[in-house]
Amino acid sequence: EKQDFGKTYLSEAIGEEILKKGKTVFYQTAPKLLSKLMEYKVLDIKKYNEMSDFLSTVDLLIIDDFGAENVTEAKKEEVLNIINSRTYNKKSMIISTNLSMKDIYTIYTDRVASRIVGDFKGYIFKGADIRLLKAKEQREVG
């Protein structure tokens, strides 16, 4: 069940503010980001290394829909590498997800989950589904 409480919108708004300060920002969904990394790792190691370096050093990395990807052992390792390299480089990161912390521990390794719990501030979005509210509003107006 996918609900929309504005996580993507808020993440993008934060990214816009960081860009205005002259910093670099990269936004991508977890499924696209991880599948591209996996593709490069197999087909073009130079591109893989360039992308890994970029993900380690961009001022703000925003990963949306975390947990929506088809999670494999290789992808779990990539997530851990991204988090570790960003922590080492003291770079900020936003992860948005519909998963609970329990889900993250179940789906990912304890190492990934413990880094997220230990290194990130968690915010829970509650309320009405924004997409449903907008659809209802449009039906009433139209």
Locate each region found by the language model.
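Conserved alpha-helical scaffold flanking the Walker A/P-loop in AAA+ ATPase domains
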Residues: 17, 36-61, 77-85
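Loop/turn-to-beta-strand initiation segments
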Residues: 22-24, 57-61, 89-95
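Walker A/P-loop
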Residues: 1-26
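Short, catalytically relevant binding-site loops at active-site mouths
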Residues: 3-5, 32-35
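Conserved Walker B
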Residues: 30, 58, 65-67
